[in-house]
Amino acid sequence: MSETIRKNIIFIFLLLGVCMTAQEKKQLGSIPQVLKSIIPDDRIDFWVLVHNHYGKNEELKISGAKKDYVPQSSGFNLFPEEDSFYYIAYSKAGKVDYITDLSGLKTFIGTIDNVEEAVIDATAEGYFIDEEFKNVAGNYYQDASNYYIDLGKLTSKECPYQKTHFTLTVNKSSGKVTGAKNNGTYIELYNKKCTNNPRLLKIEKKEVPADEPQKTKQPVRRK
């Protein structure tokens, strides 16, 4: 084998290794970690991320010289049906203001700077990181042009309670979602009140109809 061929083979293997590393899926951080990765678009003097859990405020991140702010009684969630909420207090040109909903959060983020901001942006459209099932709804990989993010979405609230996982393609330059691949349902739950519960339907099929004539017993012959 010539030296040139050997070098070409080594180069190909190195190139394949780089491609495989680039497409290796990584788990997204927890919801607080994702929120702490925000890089505001505007010139902000100060901002603080606050988590309110059962009325108790916890400051998760402080950026800039801290200023006085008023604790908020409501805020936003990045996961459906949470028992807590988040809000952001920030100061711009000396004026303190607050972020308490996802629409305001999107404006605060502005241009998508990282995969965490891409996830937050998608949350406004109903997608979320599922902390319990990150292997299907809480991971991503990337290449030079796009983020490929696996997230969950609540597609039915009852009969059944259903979660579906999607792969979103987010363009790094524009920050826009250019594709949403439906990967199917990963959670489907029926409660006792659901008339369309497959288990109940199977039981009903097995039951004998009330109007069906019963078989008469044959008399036992004695020898």
Question: Can you say where each PLM-predicted feature lies in the sequence?
Answer:
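Long, low-complexity, intrinsically disordered segments
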Residues: 211-223
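Bacterial N-terminal signal peptides that target proteins for export
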Residues: 1-9
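Cleaved targeting-peptide boundary
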Residues: 23-29
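Hydrophobic h-region of N-terminal signal peptides that target proteins for export
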Residues: 13-22
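Short, solvent-exposed aromatic-acidic interface loops
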Residues: 180-194
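Acidic, glycine-rich flexible loop segments
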Residues: 117-166, 171
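Surface-exposed acidic loop/strand-edge motifs in secreted or periplasmic proteins
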Residues: 40-140
